[in-house]
């Protein structure tokens, strides 16, 4: 379960490339998934319960581009995942995460 994230490491470097830094690349899901061609890894993702959620309210705008880019990557690779957008009143804040986490845990039976 990923809540209100930024999934492209370039955001933290003013949208510049991260060069040859493999650690940064592997922690940039929007890039890593697009470039993943190993069927074994893709199958592992397909077997997982993946939920990615964002709000559309205050302080969420910085992560929206990478949210939608990651969603497109999952769709392209046929990796099932629940990409959920909450309303414009839903901010990047603990108040909302405390509501979202129990909601999603309950939704997957935990």
Question: Language-model segments: which ranges?
Answer:
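Non-catalytic cap/lid and distal C-terminal segments of serine-dependent acyl enzymes
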Residues: 1-110
């Amino acid at each position: 379960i990923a809540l209100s994230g930024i999934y492209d490491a370039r955001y933290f470097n003013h949208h510049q490339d991260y060069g040859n830094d493999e650690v940064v690349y592997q922690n940039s899901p929007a890039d890593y998934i697009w470039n993943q061609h190993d069927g074994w890894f893709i199958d592992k993702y397909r077997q997982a319960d993946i939920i990615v959620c964002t709000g559309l309210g205050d302080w969420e705008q910085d992560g929206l581009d990478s949210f939608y880019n990651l969603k497109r990557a999952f769709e392209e690779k046929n990796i099932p995942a629940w990409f959920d957008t909450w309303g414009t009143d839903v901010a990047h804040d603990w108040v909302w995460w405390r509501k979202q986490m129990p909601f999603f845990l309950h939704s997957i039976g935990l």
